Amino acid sequence: MSSVIQVNLPQTSYNIIISPNSLGSVGRHLTSLNLEQKILVISNPEIFDYYGEIVINSLKQAGFKVFSHVIPAGETYKTLDSISKIYDTALKHRLERASTLLALGGGVIGDMTGFAAATWLRGINFIQVPTSLLAMVDASIGGKTGVNHPQGKNLIGAFYQPRLVLIDPIVLKTLPVREFRAGMAEVIKYGVIWNQGLFNQLERQKKLDSLDSINLETIQTIITQSCQAKVDVVSQDEKEAGLRAILNYGHTIGHALESLTGYREINHGEAVALGMVAAGKIAVKLGMWKEEMSQRQKNIIQKAALPVIVDYPLKSQAILESLQLDKKVKAGKVRFILPTDIGQVEIREGVPSEVITRVLEEIKM
């Protein structure tokens, strides 16, 4: 059972292929793109140990000349220094403009590989083979690439679209439970901002905390619906001039929490979950959303065993100050994405700081 979603943008188009056991046929899929021979696979040690051989063998069988570059796992390595090391490997193997960088891994690997592809020789081919749920439903789609700065997440980056996104849901079997739950945060986000049917489906599930609690057919449906939601938005607003900003639901406070904890204590999905809880509460206080809706969202987040309380010694003032460094700040005003109904949100500027502070105090231990 396979699904294909076409992404049509003003200057390019590509497919998202969602197909179980497709990792072993990555070479065949790339052959149809008429790529030049050289491919540099970028991964982290654990993912490369699991899937590097099957991907490289498939590429070689399809006639590609394959090299690899492994980056230590984690947000702390999502830096310009890591990008420079990718450039070194690209230079060593004489990658040219017609060559390809292939991201085999989660969101961190995808973001860095895409940024390296966008900037090496002013742009070479880029392929996404996401191995985490978060990367499958979010990070691999839409062309956002980049690295972190010590003072903020993804402050250095570029929009650069892949030639193909190949998703094999089977690889989720080796994904750590905590990372699976992190991906569910982005899935829940799509239900709140765009797809009421997806939200209702998540509500019907008894648990969302591991692959053991969701059968393969259901997880593939959830992945497909999530990808389609993101494609619907990105197709209308590729470079975040307006509508695409709604994809940042939960990310405003979420990014601040990640930054203030040094990208170590809390992962991206956990931060987004907390950000969604906060955004829901802000919307209620502003009279935009009903308390009942906020509680329904919170219940789904808890089904995924994601946090709804900030269990870290952070001061509300520090979080407020970090919000000012968010890349979505416009004319000095923090922009929040706030829900008005299930499947609908608004972009709101100028939320009173006292409202934000009150909500931050409510979600802290």
Swiss-Prot record:
- Catalysed transformations (reactions): 7-phospho-2-dehydro-3-deoxy-D-arabino-heptonate = 3-dehydroquinate + phosphate
Tell me if Membrane is a UniProt keyword of this record.
no
**What EC number(s) does its UniProt record assign?**
4.2.3.4
Could you tell me one molecular function GO term of this UniProt entry?
3-dehydroquinate synthase activity
> What do the Gene Ontology cellular component annotations say?
cytoplasm
Please give the InterPro entries that the UniProt record associates with this protein. Answer: Dehydroquinate_synthase, DHQ_synth_AroB, DHQ_synth_fam, DHQS/DOIS_N, DHQS_C
**Residue numbers binding NAD(+):** 107-111, 131-132, 144, 153
A GO biological-process term: aromatic amino acid family biosynthetic process
Q: What is its main location?
A: cytoplasm
Localization, per the record, is:
Cytoplasm
Could you say which cofactors this protein requires?
Answer: Co(2+); Zn(2+); NAD(+)
Q: Describe cofactor binding as the record notes it.
A: Binds 1 divalent metal cation per subunit. Can use either Co(2+) or Zn(2+).
Instruction: Write out the pathway annotation from the protein's UniProt entry.
Output: Metabolic intermediate biosynthesis; chorismate biosynthesis; chorismate from D-erythrose 4-phosphate and phosphoenolpyruvate: step 2/7
Report keywords, A-Z.
Amino-acid biosynthesis, Aromatic amino acid biosynthesis, Cobalt, Cytoplasm, Lyase, Metal-binding, NAD, Nucleotide-binding, Zinc
The residues that hold Zn(2+) are 186, 251, 268
As for what it does, the entry says:
Catalyzes the conversion of 3-deoxy-D-arabino-heptulosonate 7-phosphate (DAHP) to dehydroquinate (DHQ).
Q: Which family does it belong to?
A: Belongs to the sugar phosphate cyclases superfamily. Dehydroquinate synthase family.
- Mind telling me what this protein is named? 3-dehydroquinate synthase
